[in-house]
Structures are given as structure tokens and as C-alpha cells.
Amino acid sequence: MMPSTSLSRADTGPSAALARWRSHLQAKLGGPLDLPPLSPAAGAIAAMAADPDANTALLAEHVQRDPTIAANVLRVANSAAFAPQVPILSLQQAISWLGMSEILSISVSVWVRAQVFSVRGHEKLLSAFWHESVATACWAREIARQSRTSVELAHLCGLLQRIGRPVVVSLLADIASGESSRLTSVERARLVEEFERRAGLALAAAWTLPEPVVATIARRGTTDPSGDWSLQLRQVRLAELLAARMLEQSLDASATEQLAQALDALNIYPEQFAALEARADAVQAALSALV
């Protein structure tokens, strides 16, 4: 992990303390970061999500190279969400039962959670972030499936769109524990929101993530995306709104309007949206298996 850094106690005012935390983050993000490495197997699996020529034999080979990924793929494959008719004891069985698309998504998800969404003392916050990320990824899959576009790529973009948030939490936790009481939960949330894009792009560069994933991180919040990867940006935007609604986060009038705009951007008609909403139970089951 990153070396501990103490802040001076000279400034006791809330605004001065927040300014020092902000300065600390800027300094950290301005230099080399001690980020969790992407294992060769995980990197290859992530790249396969953006490769239309990927095949199941190669996927099985990569999964077998990482015991953590392999064990968790089997765990999820045997969960109630995927309802296997008989116990799944091998990766070949898992791929045959679930298909390459599901195995790709499960593999990336379990690895990302283990490496990034684990900061001691911040389990509750990171659990909430993880639920949001997985729910967004699962909805992105359904949106892509309906439009017959790459579900693997949609899942990856949805899962990693806000990967900068746990990175910022890790950086903040790196400051000496004696100073952490000076940062309130509101201030922490403010700093996470302010720096998540920059941190996410740093992680994307370190992991050499596929270009469409980098685009969804860099351009999150773009109201009318165009150009390269605009389809993935629009899919993930709609997925994020549907995830927020499913997780019972409040959707005010503004968010309801954003939902309508997101549907229009993808040319999704009312009957298509109704069919999409009918997949809510499947999304919830997939979410339960991955969290």
C-alpha cells in the first residue's frame, strides 16, 4: 500500500482542512501511484471483452491461470442466481452452462472487487460503491442484449465507469489515522466526486484498459455523447439511472427527466423499455450473485 502521510494540525478550520486534503490528493495524483497491479490473466480477460474474435478455449486458459478468479467463477456459477441443474465442478462445465459472455463478466467482476474495493475501515462505503457498479454493469448488459450489441463490453464499461471512487478512498485512507477525524463523510464524498475521474483514468492507464472503458470513465456525465464509443456511453448512462432506481436511491424530477433523455438517446420506445424493465428480476439475481 501507499506510504502513510500526515497532515499538519496547524489548520483547524473545516475549509482549511478540506483544502489540505485536496492538496494532498492533487500531489498524489500528480505523481506515480502505488496502484494494485493487474494480473496477466485478469488483463487478458478484460481485453477479451472488447475482442469480437475471443473464444471459449482461450478464456478458460486465462481463468485457470488465476486461482482467485477460477475459484470465484465456480462459486458464482453454482449460486442460486444461475440455478445449475447439477453442481458445477470445472471451468469447462461453467462455460458450457453459462456461456462465454457470463464467464467473462463474472471473471472481471470478482477480480476488480478483490483488488480495488477493499480498504480497511471503509467497508460500508465501498460496499455501496460496489453495489452501484455491479448494478450498472448488469443493466448495461441487458441494454446491450436488447440492441444486439456487445454485452461483454457493455458490462465492462458499466462496471469500471466509476472505478476512480475506490482509488480516491484508498488515497484518503493513506493519510495518518490521527488526522482522519478531520474529514467528515460529507467532505469525503465531495473529494471522491471531485477526483474520481482523474483517479479512474490513472488506474485505466496503469491497467491498460480497453479504449471504450477509458472513454466511459473520461466522458461520464456527458449529456449528448458523440464520436467514438458514443453508443457505450449512452448505454452506460441509461444503465446507471436504472441501477439507481433499482437500488432505491431517490429519483427526483431531474433524474426522471434524465431517464427520458437517456431512452431517447438510444431510440428506445415505450414497448422496448417495458421489455427492459421486465428484466429487473434477472438483474437483481445477477447482482446478488456478484455482491
What are the functions of these language-model segments?
Residues 1-178, 183-258, 286:
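Conserved alpha-helical "signature site"
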Residues 244-291:
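C-terminal appended segment following the main domain
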